[in-house]
Amino acid sequence: MDFLGQRMPYVTAFSKALGTGMMISADSPIGDESRSAMESLIEDYERVLSRFRNNSLTATIGKAEHGGSFDFPDWCAPLFDLYDALFSATSGAIDPCVGEDLIRLGYDASMSFTVTQDAPEHLGALRGRATWGQDVERHGTTLVTRGPVQLDFGACGKGYLVDLLGRMLRSTQFVIDAGGDLLIHAEQPISIALEDPEDSSRAIGVAHIVNGALCASAPSRRHWNVAVNERTQIAIHHLLNAIDGLPAQQTEASWAYIPCNPQHFNKLHHTADKSANATPDIARNYPAAVADGLATALFVSEVAQLQRTFDFAYATLNESRQIAASRNFPAELFLRSA
């Protein structure tokens, strides 16, 4: 990001947030009181939604042998609304219940990266895994289950936390960077290198953002190898199609962009809106969450299918290193088009 240190010299870091860390660059200092409030929000967020914390509400649902009724905080409502929309728009390919598949494939709380022996018989909704649409009954921010359900809110959870933190900033200009997922409010464009998934020291393009959210997904960020036999290993990553429970193929990286009206940042919100059911409202109020979710969805759904529900700009890189992008994607791209 060009000259960011000069334009936004005040940096606040949350090194352990969501496992990837978060960094806020701003044109004015973030005071101790604001930083403390942000730290409290991050702690509450993980205590509720992280499947990697044994004491989280999400982990409790996964251990409830007979299910139950689980009350989430009001600030979860827009996140659940977004998952409703993504589940519908992708015909179930994006589903929080994919947590069970991730665990069977080795992406569990202990990071064992060891596939369970029974995984082939149980992966995906096609083989009977629980689904958001059927096995999790939602009443606002209350989720009702009839047995243990392993939920994972990683598809858009990081972006949603970025949005909530952005609502707490009084700065005129800021950039929130959560492991490459960005929320930007600036007076002049910020230039951002689009990382090459094959070599993090290279870029396949440069985006230019003034106000908006730009989020990326790539298997290269989180993958592991599993031995089939003494001679053969297969690569597994965390971007799964929830229908069959298998890692998505053919796409190497994706980027999704949601623009923001500058007025969006001029209002101070300490908590999430309790109702944001309409998809345009979700995108307007939680652009990073939507961009995060769509960057994941681009691995498992056709663009045209997603565009029936969401208005967004995108770019994708396929296995042949050809890039496809919408005309309104705000970037210079260095590779040939698909």
Predicted regions and their residues:
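Mature catalytic core of soluble alpha/beta enzymes
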Residues: 1-338
